[in-house]
């Protein structure tokens, strides 16, 4: 059994030596002098990185360890040196998305506060706290409407957050 495995390995090794490792050379050239003619690699991009103007990042130091940028490959396919797996970093959140996130946060806050008010009334006597319930419910609706309007009114979201915090604090004081 062991002899057959050794024999198979020797046969495999001899076949591998005869093929001259062409599989790996087709996938990735080992050095600059051994490039395949039909590949997308360009000798100028590898040997003359400092003189290349068709790069994604012009501020590169062009060290040997960093990936080179090939002008034949489209920008979407280029390897980004700052990412670990070759993907470009995620784009920053736009203002519309930021406003949408803030809008969703405000809506979730208003729904939660409304549910808390209902729980508050359920645990206590409804007749004693009916006036307070109506006042708190109206305050909740007013705060929600004002905060939704202020999203479209204020471009700076920090101002909006400060306004919301102030209104929440006033609501807690009333409670």
From Swiss-Prot:
Which regions form coiled coils? none
Q: Where is the segment annotated Disordered? A: 35-70
Q: Which residues cross the membrane?
A: 106-126, 132-152
Residues in the signal sequence: none
- Ranges of Low complexity composition bias in the record: 35-56
Topology in the lipid bilayer: Multi-pass membrane protein
Asked if Membrane is a keyword of the record, the answer is yes
Listed under GO cellular component are: membrane
Q: Which residues are connected by disulfide bridges in this protein? A: none
Q: Write out the annotated subcellular location.
A: Membrane
Question: What keywords are assigned to this protein?
Answer: Membrane, Transmembrane, Transmembrane helix
Zinc-finger listed as a keyword: no
The protein in question is named Uncharacterized transmembrane protein DDB_G0291522
UniProt lineage? Eukaryota, Amoebozoa, Evosea, Eumycetozoa, Dictyostelia
